[in-house]
UniProtKB/Swiss-Prot annotation:
Protein's recorded name: Mannonate dehydratase
EC number: 4.2.1.8
Function: Catalyzes the dehydration of D-mannonate.
Family listed: Belongs to the mannonate dehydratase family.
UniProt xrefs under Gene3D superfamilies: Divalent-metal-dependent TIM barrel enzymes (3.20.20.150)
Cofactors, names only: Fe(2+); Mn(2+)
Amino acid sequence: MEQTWRWYGPNDPVSLADVRQAGATGVVTALHHIPNGEVWSVEEILKRKAIVEDAGLVWSVVESVPIHEDIKTHTGNYEQWIANYQQTLRNLAQCGIRTVCYNFMPVLDWTRTDLEYVLPDGSKALRFDQIEFAAFEMHILKRPGAEADYTEEEIAQAAERFATMSDEDKARLTRNIIAGLPGAEEGYTLDQFRKHLELYKDIDKAKLRENFAVFLKAIIPVAEEVGVRMAVHPDDPPRPILGLPRIVSTIEDMQWMVDTVNSMANGFTMCTGSYGVRADNDLVDMIKQFGPRIYFTHLRSTMREDNPKTFHEAAHLNGDVDMYEVVKAIVEEEHRRKAEGKEDLIPMRPDHGHQMLDDLKKKTNPGYSAIGRLKGLAEVRGVELAIQRAFFSR
């Protein structure tokens, strides 16, 4: 695997010098300063590429080229936004950057309720608490009909939890959910959030798939023409939330994408921390079935709790993800490609890490502190080395 590291640009508290010292050779970054939907110019792409290369690294993957909400709702200037997206892909290809991670999650990108969940060893992790999320949705957001998405027990627990929250607890929970986490291109006030949810009131799973198909049929041929590989990121968490459909959550969703646009430019990001939240997702089977279309991997683990919809981000080699079997399946896919004469490695990043050691005293991007990811990268690197030596060095 190609060892990569997500970098949020010049304002990231983790420097490119830090990235290189961590042992990564590739950088995963994006032009976050360009508004959603606008074309990434060749000039801006080359400027970022030069910064990365001057640090002795390569820009391996774009994460992400965000998709304008008009495309997801099939309203407004969606045709212009699609045309802009096509041009951005052409410009990236012209600059030699050919792997693009993206997602099709409506309104919200990845979501957590607690950004400072303290683990038994004193480090901090990200957590999604189903009951706190229900309390937000029913008692803070007050979304009409939200009760239909929860069990009677969850509704009662959410009311009880809300009753114990201070004003600061409520404000913090609201910020965590709607203000935008690292990599998310949208942040909202509560009123803005309600208005954006209203745009989806008539969009169910079938309609969102229809809108996604329009996007894929416009984008994938351009990607194929210029040699770009599109790698869709799964929903996080991988299930409907806030009354919004989610359509990249299961192996069935992956198959739908392939059936909709059967091009090798239409590929996947295997994010084990997102797909792995669902107990019914067999990660190794996903890799084996869609291995030739996996162009990027996020390797991390999560741990489901007593309520199976509640989870926290575990250490990379712990939790519900069998990292050994996952890495083994990825390495096997790389060797299959090598046997076909393809030498390209699959870019891997350790994804999120725990906030730990000296980083506990620093301001960090949630999930993206340096030391926790350094630990995760080293652990996954060790797993891969052992697999390579044991199975492929003879």
